[in-house]
A protein has these predicted regions:
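Extreme N-terminal, non-catalytic leader segments
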Residues: 1-4
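Hydrophobic anchor at the beta1->P-loop junction of P-loop NTPases
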Residues: 7
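The conserved Walker
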Residues: 11
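Conserved lysine of the Walker
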Residues: 15
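Hydrophobic positions on the alpha1 helix immediately C-terminal to the Walker A/P-loop
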Residues: 18
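Conserved substrate/cofactor phosphate-moiety recognition/catalytic segment
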Residues: 23-68
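A basic- and aromatic-enriched beta-loop-alpha substructure that forms the phosphate/nucleotide-
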Residues: 70-112
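ATP-dependent NMP and nucleoside kinases share a basic, alpha-helical "lid"
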Residues: 96-140
Length: 140
């Protein structure tokens, strides 16, 4: 069985601590855990950003983030299917450090829908919600 869980929350809400605890606990129970790193941080670290002197447009940045997130989510799910095939008695847990909906906070509803439309999602939030089995929102 493969499950996709999103770990989200504001700065200093404890995501890193909770993530480490989840991985440790599930590994004890022989569950294969795959952690999908936060996409925006990867892009920013690589030099692609929507702030500073060499910034790109905020909507273009969000499109890159969401497009990359979708690719990564699908790719890691495929890896989980490979594990499931090789080890049919072992469950797989995919933990995502943030999810597509987190990007709404950076551009607002109208612009977010515009980005979704660019990606062929037609502003349909249900297509996004249905990608996950559980969302854990940590608050500080």
């Amino acid at each position: 069985m493969i499950k996709k869980v999103v770990l989200t929350g504001g700065p200093s809400s404890g995501k890193t601590t909770v993530l480490k605890s989840i991985v440790k606990e599930f590994n004890k129970h022989f569950v294969k855990v795959i952690v999908v790193p936060e996409t925006a941080t990867e892009l920013i670290t690589a030099g692609v950003r929507m702030f500073g002197e060499d910034k790109i447009d905020a909507l273009d940045f969000q499109e890159l983030v969401i497009r990359t997130m979708i690719f990564k989510e699908d790719n890691y799910y495929r890896a989980a299917e490979m594990y499931e095939k090789l080890y049919p008695n072992q469950d797989v847990l995919i933990i995502l450090d943030r999810a597509i909906m987190d990007n709404l906070a950076y551009v607002g509803d109208e612009k977010f829908i515009e980005v979704l439309n660019r990606l062929g999602l037609n502003g349909d939030y249900s297509q996004i919600y249905n990608r996950y089995d559980l969302v854990i929102n940590l608050v500080n």
